[in-house]
Amino acid sequence: MRVMRSLRGNSGAGLISRPARLSSLRSVFTGCRAVMLPRFGGPEVFELRENVPVPNLNPNEVLVRAKAVSVNPLDCRIRAGYGRSVFQPHLPIIVGRDVSGEVAAIGTSVKSLKVGQEVFGALHPTALRGTYTDYGILSEDELTEKPSSISHVEASAIPFAALTAWRALKSNARITEGQRLLVFGGGGAVGFSAIQLAVASGCHVTASCVGQTKDRILAAGAEQAVDYTTEDIELAVKGKFDAVLDTIGGPETERIGINFLRKGGNYMTLQGEAASLTDKYGFVVGLPLATSLLMKKKIQYQYSHGIDYWWTYMRADPEGLAEIQRLVGAGKLKIPVEKTFSITDVVAAHEAKEKKQIPGKVVLEF
């Protein structure tokens, strides 16, 4: 990583310290540190820069002084070139989606948050100015108050993954009390969030996982956890399900998941092909091709199995974020953090994730 006068221990440099309500035309904040992505590649392409401009806030936006941000798989994929059709024209960009911190300033129309309040939240997957920076900018509906019962490190690990799971379960499948949910990849952040959200909704949950996460999944309320490295899930699991969330997204898990659904059920995969096809063929060809592929699968599975098929992506959802906050505050939703790094060690953090040295959640601290 190229470091341009790192400001570790002086994250306020280049800033006037007075927090304020900001109009969309001016800002009392001039610049801050940020981890910039000037080109796609391995972890070494990151540059830690100082005095990166802080844009003026729009009326509905909030300036958040970051205390912790998590490293999501999407961050690593974007760094390596995923979504280049969206991001390449805007390089250098700031990656990162999750953040937990303190409100430093608010736009003129923001009503639910105030300066000095501790908050956490997540940006949309295609946001160009991410959260790997001292001062992140999110819209009001992308943030909520951080429960006092958890730390910024713990909070930063939650929102993007939990909102992705929320969209799958509540917007796509619309799960209700008493229904059965099967999760492929229950040990990952999205899968583990889905288990906890479904249990809180009164659902019966079964999950596939690797052995070291089995106890944690059962402790979270799942009724069955199947170690796919040693067990055959098609033999170990009995009965039909109302919904399947596939966080793995391979041909085999899709086949198995579809066959486990009862008629009227919902199959949701995180591995939709809109971005990859657009990257390969461009917007003009790739986006219609992706839409056509999705519709083909929807029609195919509706005809052959009587189920609905979805590509699931995270979206801002104030109602979902409010419920996530409530469950977090009640101790019913958490994502374990395996290791923390300083923001100045972002290259090491990404290298560890890329080499699969740290299977669990990684957080960057400021």
Residue ranges and their predicted role:
Residues 1-32:
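N-terminal mitochondrial targeting presequence
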Residues 2, 25-58, 65-106, 111-366:
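Terminal helix/beta-alpha structural elements that buttress the NAD(P)+-binding lobe
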